[in-house]
């Protein structure tokens, strides 16, 4: 049973609409869908939305992406949650924009936020929802790319992806991870 949905991103207005903040975007949408307490609380280095009707919290770590593990560890401790009871939502360069993948566990795949979580909580055994953002043409452009906003053309598809990710998470909360995989794992292009 999932007890915390953790959307990864970078805090601050500067990063609000960037590719790296897809996790935050999904977290906001889910919090709205579940009618969570909109007055987030600063706890565990995160903005926490409490959703008492669903016995789940939505967290947006405020540690910056590369230090996400610190926030996740504090969430686990403060809320007495096991790694298997969190769902981490984040951007994935290796998936095209429009792809969504739900996984029970796995490696970091080179994602620094996930790497930080794995290194800090000492396990890869936590569920995650990967949101494809595509990859830039040149490898040296990766950091600029993930910190750039979506183009006007991409925004149309992004809205569909965010809606699908929201539905996926609602499904996970209702039916669990394994029963939700077929519904969640899609390419929307």
Swiss-Prot record:
One of its GO terms (molecular function) is tRNA binding. Keywords: Cytoplasm, Hydrolase, RNA-binding, tRNA-binding. Gene3D superfamilies: Peptidyl-tRNA hydrolase. The record marks 91 as: Stabilizes the basic form of H active site to accept a proton. The active site is at 20 (proton acceptor). Its main location: cytoplasm. NCBIfam families: pth (TIGR00447). Belongs to the PTH family. Monomer. This is Peptidyl-tRNA hydrolase. It comes from Sulfurihydrogenibium sp. (strain YO3AOP1). The lineage of its organism: Bacteria, Pseudomonadati, Aquificota, Aquificia, Aquificales.
């Amino acid at each position: 049973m999932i007890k915390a949905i953790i959307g990864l991103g970078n805090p601050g207005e500067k990063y609000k609409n960037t590719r790296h903040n897809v996790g935050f975007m999904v977290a906001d949408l889910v919090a709205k869908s579940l009618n969570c307490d909109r007055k987030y609380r600063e706890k565990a280095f995160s903005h926490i939305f409490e959703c008492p009707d669903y016995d789940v919290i939505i967290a947006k770590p405020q540690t910056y992406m590369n230090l996400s593990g610190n926030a996740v560890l504090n969430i686990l401790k403060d809320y007495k949650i096991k790694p298997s009871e969190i769902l981490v939502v984040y951007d994935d360069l290796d998936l095209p924009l429009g792809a969504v993948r739900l996984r029970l566990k796995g490696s970091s795949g080179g994602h620094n936020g996930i790497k930080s979580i794995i290194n800090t909580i000492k396990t890869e055994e936590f569920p995650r929802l990967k949101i494809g953002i595509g990859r830039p043409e040149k490898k040296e452009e990766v950091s600029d790319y993930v910190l750039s906003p979506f183009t006007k053309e991409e925004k149309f598809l992004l809205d569909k992806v965010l809606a699908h990710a929201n539905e996926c998470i609602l499904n996970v909360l209702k039916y669990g991870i394994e029963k939700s995989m077929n519904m969640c794992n899609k390419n929307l292009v």
